[in-house]
Amino acid sequence: MIDSEALESERVKLKRDIADLRANLNRKEQCLRELEAAIAAGEDSDEAEESSNDMPTPQTKLTNDDIARYSRQLILQDFGVQGQLKLKNSSVLIVGMGGLGCPAAQYLVAAGCGHLGLIDYDEVERSNLHRQILHSEHRCGMSKAESARIALLELNSHCQIRCHSRLINSMNAMHIIRPYDVVLDCSDNVATRYLLNDACVMLRKPLVSGSALKMDGQLTVYGYGQGPCYRCIYPVPPPPEAVTNCGDGGVLGAVTGIIGAMQALEAIKVIIGLGDVMSGRLLIFDGSSFMFRNIRIRTKRPNCHVCSAQPLITELIDYEMFCGMHATDKDNPLDLLEPDQRLEVKEYHQKLQSQPHLLLDVRPPAEFEICQLPRSINVPLSEILDDSYLKRFAKQLEDKELPIVLLCRRGNDSQIAVQHITNRFPAHSIRDLVGGLHAWTGSVDATFPIY
């Protein structure tokens, strides 16, 4: 007898594999085009990317095209010709071509920034497109930096754009940052924030920092004038378990657009000396109530380890070790449980699924609504940690023979939940599904949605 469900799962898996192959082909073809362009220009592509030589000779006048293109900002009293020339001769480095970096780059290029550097180690995915507005469906699988450059050059072909399709780290940060006038931190992860802060302090570069999560955003400028640096405000990194990224907490695309656009504005103000730069202050945006708050933050810390008169840190360190987390926005897989407390999705599917058991999905209700396994019961991790689940499952918990299986999106929160319940009921058989729903899609049912 033909198993139609298995055939459909295999069909979907093959289509997904073909899409991945096409994306990889697009990426390889783009790399080939870049290499051929570099060869045609008589330069080695790696040298073009890595070069720390000075930027081209400053321009002393605007062209007719400049005047026509930028006329609406040229007529601003505090901007004018000199402001446009400063912008034309400026160089800005954007770290992270995601939800913040895309709108920031778009507005800087549109305004006439002469030289732009783009850093991103990652590739475009469909889950990026709702907020990373420079990328497109047909460029999924391509380097984010390269994808952004294509879109930006369509907007303004006069801008010189240099791509760094790699992870910025302690080994390359000083070399990459040195040629630029201003740096935008659009990375939105803690380890990279400390890295960029320290490098910018050592190189005396202003750092325009933005962040966005859920419906909220923040913006400030570090290391500008007599203002504080990031370490002045946060001398010690937060514990890893207290940090939430947009992959877990979610974010509304328009919020990243607002913060990214304001980062571009602050960069322009720094470059041309316009207005009151957001240094020594923090802008907090609440998208749910659409309220902006502008609060004053502490001044420079006299004993700051980086920006004080006698700094303790004079060279870049291992920031992943310092922060206890990776310098990316990817989820770090936890390893909290013993092997006998973990259950592979294939084993669950083949053996346990048909037997009596209790399957608890510890994701938030909004995520449970997106998709769920049959017969799973939604018990958010927050309910487990505050023990409010005990009343709901008192009878099941009395039965020590009833297996309890916990799952989540990627297999991290379920481990935390297993630890907590096991401490309460050590005699019970309580296990988590390794890899969560992502593993279920990859190993059992390719038609199950991934988010």
From Swiss-Prot:
It comes from the Eukaryota. It is an enzyme of class 2 (transferase). Residues 42-62 are annotated as: Disordered. Binds 1 zinc ion per subunit. SMART domains: RHOD. Its EC number is 2.7.7.80, 2.8.1.11. It is found in: Cytoplasm. Residues 353-449 form the Rhodanese domain. Keywords: ATP-binding, Cytoplasm, Metal-binding, Molybdenum cofactor biosynthesis, Multifunctional enzyme, Nucleotide-binding, Phosphoprotein, Transferase, tRNA processing, Zinc. ATP binds at G99, D120, S127, N128, L129, H130, R131, K144, D188, N189. The modification Phosphothreonine is found at T60. GO terms for molecular function: ATP binding; metal ion binding; molybdopterin-synthase adenylyltransferase activity; molybdopterin-synthase sulfurtransferase activity; thiosulfate-cyanide sulfurtransferase activity; URM1 activating enzyme activity. Its cofactor is Zn(2+). It catalyses: [molybdopterin-synthase sulfur-carrier protein]-C-terminal Gly-Gly + ATP + H(+) = [molybdopterin-synthase sulfur-carrier protein]-C-terminal Gly-Gly-AMP + diphosphate; [molybdopterin-synthase sulfur-carrier protein]-C-terminal Gly-Gly-AMP + S-sulfanyl-L-cysteinyl-[cysteine desulfurase] + AH2 = [molybdopterin-synthase sulfur-carrier protein]-C-terminal-Gly-aminoethanethioate + L-cysteinyl-[cysteine desulfurase] + A + AMP + 2 H(+). Zn(2+) binds at C229, C232, C304, C307. GO terms for cellular component: cytosol. Residues 43-52 have a biased composition (Acidic residues). It holds the Pfam family ThiF. InterPro entries: MOCS3/Uba4, Rhodanese-like_dom, Rhodanese-like_dom_sf, ThiF/MoeB/HesA, ThiF_NAD_FAD-bd, Ubiquitin-activating_enz. The active site is at C246 (glycyl thioester intermediate), C408 (cysteine persulfide intermediate). Plays a central role in 2-thiolation of mcm(5)S(2)U at tRNA wobble positions of cytosolic tRNA(Lys), tRNA(Glu) and tRNA(Gln). Also essential during biosynthesis of the molybdenum cofactor. Acts by mediating the C-terminal thiocarboxylation of sulfur carriers URM1 and MOCS2A. Its N-terminus first activates URM1 and MOCS2A as acyl-adenylates (-COAMP), then the persulfide sulfur on the catalytic cysteine is transferred to URM1 and MOCS2A to form thiocarboxylation (-COSH) of their C-terminus. PANTHER family: ADENYLYLTRANSFERASE AND SULFURTRANSFERASE MOCS3, UBIQUITIN-ACTIVATING ENZYME E1. In the N-terminal section; belongs to the HesA/MoeB/ThiF family. UBA4 subfamily. This is Adenylyltransferase and sulfurtransferase MOCS3-2. It comes from Drosophila pseudoobscura pseudoobscura (Fruit fly).
